[in-house]
């Protein structure tokens, strides 16, 4: 649903990045991905992408996940409801007893679900927020957990700073035809000047391994199907854009966005996006979508004019129709950070951040561990700077000194108590919404 079809997971071994060991449900899904690609293209890994060896196209991914849960649906142990949003949490005293949903479309009726346990694995933690459970959003100050990368005090961005969202763009070759999208209203060429200094496409089959520098370009970064190097049929080439230039910081918002928020709800432009109801989040996310389309437009026009015509030009790529959306974009953006549950146990940066380039066992290994992990602490650019005096004008992203791609975790485990709120029996967190601090919790 986010269009993220290149699985970016790695670990460093002998100075080179390689896939981390696969197991469990993750391995099962990868086997299904490889089986689909082998049946469709004759090879299990057709993408030759810079960021990962495993790639899958949107419609195929949806089918794989549907097939994965189909036996449970058939047995009646799982029921799937779609196009619903939580609007009310039902409680008896402090205990959570259910959730009331409203339809996100006119055709979807409302629904009330009563259950002894409610698990919130949503992007923004909607049920946790509505339940009254304690949670955090945005940065924690250094004084709270004594984390080295935490700010000592808030500046003008306050608590709004988050890992940015990205509206991904999935593209297929248009068989040599031009398929240039209209110029988005918010487009400014200067916002995408970083693309004017690099090659939009490189002729690499990534035989040097993932993250080989010679294979990096916006096109090959997360390519889904490489028909040129794999000698596949014309029309099969596919890629998707999830490049830092399209990242959309959630603080220092453009004036048009702040005005839209204030007109809808005074004071909301200064709040963290997590705290906002759905209709206010949509004001911000609509501008994030426009920014992503601006990047594609820039690649199809300004970058094409600079490089000249060639078969892999973005000018000859069209938006996929696999999502079934009017604008042919994924129905939701790639959301890297939501709220953080105030849980019985909160894992901090001091518990697991690697002190060397050779990760070892984490400083704290919880005795109630439910899963093991090790990953790169992946902050995309969290802030923006405006390039003119116009607060609606062109802007570019900023990486801060303490939030970037430069840190890793040791070999760590996550505690069961990190899913349990300090007060709200019957409620559990999952996914983004667990007991962790923003200094390290950046789920892929």
What are the functions of these language-model segments?
Residues 2-88, 163-164:
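Conserved N-terminal/central alpha/beta ligand/cofactor-binding core
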Residues 60-64, 294, 444:
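Short amphipathic alpha-helical face segments that pack within enzyme cores
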Residues 2-3, 83, 106-117, 121-443:
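Flavin (FAD/FMN)-binding glycine-rich loop and adjacent Rossmann-like elements that form
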Residues 92-93, 301:
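Short acidic-glycine loop/turn motifs at beta-strand connectors
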Residues 90-91, 146:
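Short secondary-structure boundary/hinge segments and terminal tails
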Residues 93-99:
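Short, hydrophobic/aromatic-rich segments at coil-to-beta transitions
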């Amino acid at each position: 649903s986010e269009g993220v079809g290149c699985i970016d997971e790695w670990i460093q071994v002998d100075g080179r990045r390689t896939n981390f060991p696969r197991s469990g449900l993750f391995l099962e899904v990868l086997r299904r991905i490889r089986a689909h690609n082998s049946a469709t293209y004759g090879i299990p890994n057709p993408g030759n992408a810079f960021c990962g060896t495993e790639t899958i196209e949107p419609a195929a991914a949806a089918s794989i996940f549907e097939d994965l849960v189909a036996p449970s649906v058939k047995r009646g142990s799982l029921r799937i409801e779609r196009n619903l949003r939580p609007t009310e949490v039902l409680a008896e005293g402090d205990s959570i007893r259910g959730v009331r949903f409203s339809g996100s479309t006119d055709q979807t009726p409302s629904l009330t679900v009563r259950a002894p346990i409610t698990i919130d694995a949503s992007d923004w933690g909607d049920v946790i927020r509505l339940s009254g459970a304690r949670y955090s959003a945005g940065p924690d100050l250094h004084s709270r957990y004594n984390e080295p990368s935490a700010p000592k005090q808030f500046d003008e961005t306050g608590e709004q700073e988050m890992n940015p969202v990205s509206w991904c763009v999935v593209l297929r070759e248009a068989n040599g035809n031009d398929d240039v999208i209209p110029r988005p209203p918010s487009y400014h060429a200067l916002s995408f000047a970083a693309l004017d200094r690099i090659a939009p496409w490189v002729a690499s089959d990534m035989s040097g391994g993932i993250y080989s520098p010679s294979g990096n370009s916006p096109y090959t970064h997360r390519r889904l199907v490489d028909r040129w190097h794999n000698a596949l049929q014309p029309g099969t080439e596919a890629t998707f854009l999830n490049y830092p230039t399209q990242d959309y910081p959630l603080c220092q918002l453009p004036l048009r966005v702040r005005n839209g928020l204030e007109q809808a709800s005074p004071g909301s432009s200064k709040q963290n996006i997590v705290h906002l109801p759905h209709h206010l989040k949509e004001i911000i996310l609509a501008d994030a979508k426009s920014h992503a389309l601006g990047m594609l437009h820039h690649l199809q026009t300004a970058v094409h004019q600079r490089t000249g015509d060639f078969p892999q030009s973005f000018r000859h790529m069209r938006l996929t129709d696999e999502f079934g959306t009017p604008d042919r974009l994924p129905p939701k953006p790639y959301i890297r950070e939501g709220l953080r549950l105030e849980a019985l146990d909160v894992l901090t940066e001091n518990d697991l951040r690697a002190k060397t380039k050779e990760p070892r066992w984490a400083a704290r290994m919880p005795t109630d561990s439910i899963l093991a992990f090790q990953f790169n602490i992946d902050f995309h650019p969290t802030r923006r700077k405006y390039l003119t005096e116009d607060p609606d004008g062109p802007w570019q992203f900023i990486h801060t000194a303490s939030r970037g791609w430069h840190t890793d975790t040791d070999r760590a485990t996550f505690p069961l108590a990190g899913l349990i709120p300090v007060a709200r029996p019957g409620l559990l967190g999952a996914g983004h919404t667990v007991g962790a601090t923003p200094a390290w919790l950046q789920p892929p």
